[in-house]
Regions:
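Acidic helix-start/capping segments at beta-turn-to-alpha-helix junctions
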Residues: 64-78
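Electron-transfer interface patches adjacent to heme c in soluble/periplasmic c-type cytochromes
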Residues: 80-110, 127-136
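Short microdomains enriched in Cys/His and/or Lys/Arg
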Residues: 38-42, 74-89
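Sequence/structural segment immediately N-terminal to covalent heme-attachment motifs in c-type
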Residues: 42-55, 77
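Post-cleavage N-terminal segment of exported redox proteins
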Residues: 1-39, 145-150
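C-terminal capping alpha-helices of c-type cytochrome domains
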Residues: 114-116, 123, 127-150
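Sequence context of c-type cytochrome heme-c attachment sites
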Residues: 26-41, 90-94, 120-125
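The canonical Cys-X-X-Cys-His
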Residues: 50-61, 117, 139
Length: 150
């Protein structure tokens, strides 16, 4: 019984201790001129859906949830955001070549069609981020139009 108490105390001290390890924040006060929304004159309804469903992980400005202040959850989110931005950063859209843009648009279309994005782990907590069938069609049609006009 004594060993269990010691292990519990060590675990509690460790958990409290890791709360003081900072994480990198993905927040910016400005929207760059190279942003996907600005460059492509995206309709307002699609802008809103992309903001809610995509931009937290695929831009330079994440709207952090309350649970981001708890370790080790914050580390998981930080890694997830870094991976998302490495794959696609909407804020850097205009810096991509036409060929790369077409590739990214094909990928976006495919992932929305297959229900791969937004991730289930994200929509589990952020219900508003999930695409309805109508929203998915609208976004896919817009992305297809963009790709065809490159």
């Amino acid at each position: 019984m004594k060993i269990v108490k010691i292990i519990a105390i060590i675990a509690l001290v460790g958990f409290v201790g890791i709360q003081f390890i900072p994480t990198e924040r993905n927040q910016s006060d400005t929207v760059p001129e190279s942003d996907f929304m600005l460059v492509n004159n995206v309709p307002e309804t699609i802008q809103k859906k992309l903001q809610v469903s995509c931009y937290d992980c695929h831009s330079n400005n994440t709207q952090y949830p309350w649970y981001n202040k708890i370790q080790p959850v914050a580390w998981f989110l930080e890694d997830h955001i870094k991976e998302g931005k490495a794959e696609l950063n909407f804020n850097e859209w205009d810096s991509l070549s036409s060929r790369r843009k077409a590739s990214k648009l094909r990928s976006i279309i495919k992932q929305i069609e297959n229900g791969e994005m937004p991730l289930d782990s994200y929509t589990l907590i952020h219900k508003e981020a999930a695409f309805s069938e109508e929203e998915a069609k609208e976004v896919i049609n817009f992305m297809t139009q963009l790709k065809d006009n490159l």
